[in-house]
């Protein structure tokens, strides 16, 4: 057990959250650069150089310059082993992001310093609040003109309801960006442009009162001293206990594109972020130091390797140790499986995992038996909780251009729904197929992937569906009566769960009044 504890103590598993275009994928690249996982960072937008960002590996992401699926990357840094989960930056992919946040122990929140707190960031912070996830904040894009840093921190505190403790402080911004002052280390790190793709030594001046500071940045030195007097009086000091409870966030400033300030964030994560945490199950709390292996699946990704048309289930290890060839118990289906070919990830590059410990993410080859939310143990029968499915907000009927490909269409849709990209509903009374999504872009992704991966050309038609609810009832007789009377509004989802498809909210409310013994659920545990 002591060997396990040593490995657990080394792990830091975190995700990056942000509003689209705040620079999340760029910062992912630079984090990997500092972790020696990349020799030269790709940049996301424009892509004239042909360097696609390493974490945006799916074809559609490369075309659009947005992160659609969750990538997992592991690298060593500062004596720790860091697992970074890159989440979709586009607002349409909140479900995938939500599930990813159930698999991490801390988050890095990236904010565009010219814009401040944006809508998507607010939503994601609400999700992290559900588990009191510790948050590290990075104020990005200092190489552009930014809002007043004190105003930015005030906004984070008032809008996101979390105290801010500045760790670094900017000196100028935009064309006048000179560098940052590291408050805890009492040193100024000078900025130099044009160093975005490689790691080079920066000039560091020790001490805010060092006369060399005037020589380096002129009148900005006196301004910095004045500003720091103000900042110290107006802001919180870093409190590790408050950070671990999700009540306070350490704030770093920098520019991901200029590769500046990223190492400070990583230093902070390694030093302060929690090691793998205990996990709730429906039977007990599972401690990471336990000897027996446990884990849960938070994502399924189809066709990570177009050459092999495979599916991989992403599993967070919660306790014990994975060893190549070990036997695992797949709790939902009650079967034991031998796993000899689990994978580790470097964003699309896959290597066979010899071993893995709590906090690590491994990939299991999935031939249709594994679903999101599945728990694996070494024999114990319990289920990890807290991996939800949300009722979709948009619906379309999907039609084939070639009616003979109905079988391939259904197979493709079921596989895409199993990986959580979209939800599929098959009405009980008709042969229609209804696709439900959280945002419009998901519909485009599904049609694109059906064509490229399943050779199926499909189109959408409008359908009068406003919302969906999963239907439950303990009384089998009442459920059967409900099925008979409301069959025109009932469908089965991709997992064959009974679902009520409501044409309007009025219709849903009337049905809920008419059938008080039936539960109409907005979310469903996987």
Swiss-Prot record:
Annotated binding of GTP, by residue: 18-25, 86-90, 140-143
Family: Belongs to the TRAFAC class translation factor GTPase superfamily. Classic translation factor GTPase family. PrfC subfamily.
InterPro entries registered for this protein in UniProt: EF-G-like_DII (IPR053905), EFG_III/V (IPR035647), G_TR_CS (IPR031157), P-loop_NTPase (IPR027417), PrfC (IPR004548), RF3_C (IPR032090), RF3_dom_3_sf (IPR038467), RF3_GTP-bd (IPR041732)
Pfam families hit by this protein: EF-G_D2, GTP_EFTU, RF3_C
A Gene Ontology biological process term: regulation of translational termination
Sequence ranges assigned to domain tr-type G in this UniProt record: 9-277
Protein name per UniProt: Peptide chain release factor 3
Keywords: Cytoplasm, GTP-binding, Nucleotide-binding, Protein biosynthesis
Keyword Nucleotide-binding found: yes
One MF annotation (Gene Ontology) recorded for this entry: GTPase activity
Protein purpose: Increases the formation of ribosomal termination complexes and stimulates activities of RF-1 and RF-2. It binds guanine nucleotides and has strong preference for UGA stop codons. It may interact directly with the ribosome. The stimulation of RF-1 and RF-2 is significantly reduced by GTP and GDP, but not by GMP.
Gene Ontology cellular component list: cytosol
Subcellular location per the Swiss-Prot or TrEMBL entry: Cytoplasm
């Amino acid at each position: 057990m002591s060997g396990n504890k040593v490995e657990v103590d080394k792990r830091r598993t975190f995700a990056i959250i942000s509003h689209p275009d705040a620079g999340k994928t760029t910062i992912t690249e630079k984090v990997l650069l500092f972790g020696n996982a990349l020799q030269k960072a790709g940049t996301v937008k424009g892509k004239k150089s042909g360097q696609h960002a390493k974490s945006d590996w799916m074809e559609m992401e490369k075309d659009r310059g947005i992160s659609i699926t969750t990538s997992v990357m592991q690298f060593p840094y500062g004596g720790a082993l860091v697992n970074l989960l890159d989440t979709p930056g586009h607002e349409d992919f909140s479900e995938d992001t939500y599930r990813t946040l159930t698999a991490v122990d801390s988050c890095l929140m990236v904010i565009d310093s010219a814009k401040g707190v944006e809508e998507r960031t607010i939503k994601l912070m609400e999700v992290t609040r559900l588990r009191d996830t510790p948050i590290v904040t990075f104020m990005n894009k200092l190489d552009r003109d930014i809002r007043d840093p004190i105003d930015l921190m005030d906004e984070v505190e008032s809008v996101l309801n979390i105290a801010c403790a500045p760790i670094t402080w900017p000196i100028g911004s935009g064309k006048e960006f000179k560098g940052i002052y590291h408050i805890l280390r009492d040193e100024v790190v000078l900025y130099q442009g044009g160093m975005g793709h490689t790691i080079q030594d920066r000039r560091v001046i020790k001490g805010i009162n060092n006369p060399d500071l005037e020589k380096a940045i002129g009148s900005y030195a006196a301004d910095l001293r004045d500003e720091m007097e103000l900042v110290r009086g107006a802001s919180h000091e870093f409190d590790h206990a408050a950070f671990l409870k999700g009540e306070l966030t350490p704030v770093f400033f920098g520019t991901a594109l200029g590769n500046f300030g990223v190492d400070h964030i990583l230093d902070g994560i390694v030093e302060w972020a929690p090691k793998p945490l205990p996990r709730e199950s429906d039977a007990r709390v599972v401690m990471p130091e336990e000897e027996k292996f446990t884990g849960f699946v938070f994502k399924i990704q189809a066709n990570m390797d177009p050459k092999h048309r495979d599916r991989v289930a992403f599993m967070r290890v919660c306790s014990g140790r994975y060893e190549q060839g070990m036997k695992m118990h797949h709790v939902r289906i009650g079967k034991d499986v031998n796993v000899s070919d689990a994978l580790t990830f470097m964003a699309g590059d896959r290597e066979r995992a010899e071993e893995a410990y709590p906090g690590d993410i491994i990939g299991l080859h999935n031939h249709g038996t594994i679903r999101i939310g599945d728990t694996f143990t070494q024999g114990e029968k319990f289920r990890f909780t807290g991996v939800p499915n949300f009722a979709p907000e948009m619906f379309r009927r999907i039609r084939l251009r070639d009616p003979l490909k109905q079988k391939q269409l259904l197979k493709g849709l079921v596989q895409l729904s199993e990986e959580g990209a979209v939800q599929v509903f098959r009405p009980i009374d008709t042969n229609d197929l209804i696709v439900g999504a959280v945002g419009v872009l998901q519909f485009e992704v599904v049609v694109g992937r059906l064509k490229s991966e399943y050779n199926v050309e499909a189109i959408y038609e409008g359908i009068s569906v406003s919302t969906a609810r999963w239907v439950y009832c303990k009384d089998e007789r009442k459920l059967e009566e409900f099925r008979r009377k409301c069959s025109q509004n009932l469908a089965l989802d991709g997992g064959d769960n009974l679902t009520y498809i409501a044409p309007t909210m009025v219709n849903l409310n009337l049905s809920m009044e008419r059938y008080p013994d039936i539960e109409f659920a907005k979310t469903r545990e996987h």
